[in-house]
Amino acid sequence: MKELARFSVTLPNELFDEINKRVKNTEYPSRSEFIRDLVREKIIADKWKDDSQSDAIAVLSIVYSHHQNNLVSQMLELEHHADVKIACSTHIHIDKENCLEMISLQGSGKNIEKFSQKIGSLKGVKFSNLARIGITKA
């Protein structure tokens, strides 16, 4: 088992109550595990702000109209000339008008962000969300 460090944190009562409520309403076994996950999320978010990060991973989810002229060809053009590695993409037909595409990306955080913005700004893209993924050592 990994060594653990114990420390004390002082919180306003309202924040402490909110944490307890969230732990109780989720599957977290303890406040400690909940807090560990919050710290990991913050570390990952801060790593994404570091332009030198070269090993970033993300999933870009987009909803778009497949009836939009040239949209699919524009997306493919951007994907083939991207400065990021596209590990895979999954395409789902939502209805007669809309498609959902999920694109797994690897590369520098800066290049992933740039690629996401290019795709999200295309005419016909109705929704774009970049899920930034990171792995911490603990």
UniProtKB/Swiss-Prot annotation:
Q: Name one GO biological process term.
A: response to nickel cation
Q: Which UniProt keywords apply?
A: DNA-binding, Metal-binding, Nickel, Transcription, Transcription regulation
Question: Which Pfam family, giving just one, matches this sequence?
Answer: RHH_1
The protein's matches in Gene3D superfamilies, at most eight in alphabetical order, are given as:
ACT-like. Chain A, domain 2 (3.30.70.1150), Met repressor-like (1.10.1220.10)
A GO molecular function term, named singly, is:
DNA-binding transcription factor activity
> Which cofactors does this protein require?
Ni(2+)
Q: What does this protein do?
A: Transcriptional regulator.
Question: What HAMAP family does the entry give?
Answer: NikR
Question: What's this protein's name?
Answer: Putative nickel-responsive regulator
Lineage, uppermost ranks? Bacteria, Pseudomonadati, Campylobacterota, Epsilonproteobacteria, Campylobacterales
